[in-house]
A protein has these predicted regions:
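Nucleotidyltransferase catalytic core that binds NTPs
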Residues: 1-130
Length: 130
């Protein structure tokens, strides 16, 4: 789910390049069951990303292996500093990485949880259904 943290990240990344391509994982939960599945279709998410003025193109991928292969065709990769000491797909690819500061507390998982918690009880009582 897009939140202001993503917009800030795209703006920051775009300041380093002329063309910003965003890689969109179709469903991260297929390879990482601990991840929540996307709420919106890949087509809807791609349309939203393309409407952001800092994003020039979006490529989608189903498997981490495909994303790994995409990376070999790009000059620069942008990652949040929260990934610096961890593992991430393509760590072995010889590509320049620009580490973007994540100076916010936004989280897609937290946003999904907040939405769930805000509608759970009213929906159990039958509200929200037309």
């Amino acid at each position: 789910m897009i939140h202001p943290g993503y917009i800030r990240m795209f703006k920051d990344a775009k300041s380093y390049c002329n063309h910003l391509t965003v890689a969109l994982h179709e469903n991260p939960s297929t390879e990482r069951p601990q991840k929540l599945p996307p709420v919106q279709s890949v087509e809807d998410r791609k349309e939203i990303l393309l409407s952001i003025k800092y994003v020039d193109a979006v490529v989608t991928y189903q498997k981490e292996k495909s994303f790994h292969d995409y990376l070999k065709h790009y000059d620069i990769r942008f990652l949040g500093t929260d990934y610096r000491d961890g593992s991430y797909t393509g760590k072995d690819v010889n590509i320049d990485i620009i580490w973007l500061n994540r100076e916010h507390d936004y989280s897609s998982t937290k946003l999904k949880t907040d939405i769930y918690n805000s509608v759970k009880e009213p929906m159990q009582r039958g509200y929200g259904y037309d």
